[in-house]
UniProtKB/Swiss-Prot annotation:
NCBIfam families: rpoA (TIGR02027). InterPro entries: DNA-dir_RNA_pol_insert, DNA-dir_RNA_pol_RpoA/D/Rpb3, DNA-dir_RpoA, RBP11-like, RNAP_asu_C, RNApol_insert_sf. It catalyses: RNA(n) + a ribonucleoside 5'-triphosphate = RNA(n+1) + diphosphate. DNA-dependent RNA polymerase catalyzes the transcription of DNA into RNA using the four ribonucleoside triphosphates as substrates. This is DNA-directed RNA polymerase subunit alpha. It is found in: Plastid, Chloroplast. Keywords: Chloroplast, DNA-directed RNA polymerase, Nucleotidyltransferase, Plastid, Transcription, Transferase. One of its GO terms (molecular function) is DNA-directed RNA polymerase activity. CDD domains: RNAP_alpha_NTD (cd06928). The gene is rpoA. GO terms for cellular component: chloroplast; DNA-directed RNA polymerase complex; mitochondrion. The lineage of its organism: Eukaryota, Viridiplantae, Streptophyta, Embryophyta, Tracheophyta.
Amino acid sequence: MVREKVKVSTRTLQWRCVESRRDSKRLYYGRFILSPLMKGQADTIGIAMRRALLGEIEGTCITRAKSENIPHDYSNIVGIQESVHEILMNLNEIVLRSNLYGTRNALICVQGPGYITARDIILPPSVEIVDNTQHIATVTESIDLCIGLKIERNRGYSLKMSNNFEDRSYPIDAVFMPVQNANHSIHSYGNGNGKQEILFLEIWTNGSLTPKEALHEASRNLINLFIPFLHVEEETFHLENNQHQVTLPLFPFHNRLVNLRKKKKELAFQYIFIDQLELPPRIYNCLKKSNIHTLLDLLNNSQEDLIKIEHFHIEDVKKILDILEKK
């Protein structure tokens, strides 16, 4: 466990981790402070951060299991101590760590008798298990058991539908929430108009990421939500014919994209593939999945189009522009 004495700065706003510990493979704890804040700011930030930590961070879960030996999810398999329902519940609790996008397949294939744990799951390279000792089932007889698994990355909850069975595959309730709990508290100091606040933020995670990583991702997601309000090229929103529709102004770096198109010849763009741009792997994969293969494909999309791509962030657009301007 790491613990620091809290020293309050009276100058620049800063944050610091003052306590960090690992209680188990599936329980991490971190305590952070942000100071100095003006009166009222700590509560504003604390509420927003807590909601972002609990609802805006993606997690990876097993969402479906399939086996030819399972007639329905409340049946029993000969030679298996647990019911199918209990096995599905155990799979639901497996904690995974990954940066995958989309869906991946995994497999359990064992021969009894013996105990089946998370260690027996054959995973794709992009996924790893946080706690290999998590129990799945007990095989009491000399039988072969194979279970196919589907793994997804998402946020929030995914509740199974009882009638959503596909070819003897069974959906599993998934909780895509790496942060198990988050609390904030406020300490005030000073008098009168000089009164200031310290924000204390406590974060508990399931081990798939650290509290510090969770804080970083939640902060980034909050920034992405607020960026549309930071436009500088237009001061007001313009209502279209439909008064319920609002056209958002362009992003501040829109002119950079326009200037880039003017400087370079579009004829050459179609012969430059995004493979040549040395993009970060995540950005490259997002573009590929959206059928963007060449520089021409890329520049034919506006920045608004790009940020609509799944798992694509606003800062990724700026990063792409920075790379293109160097070419």
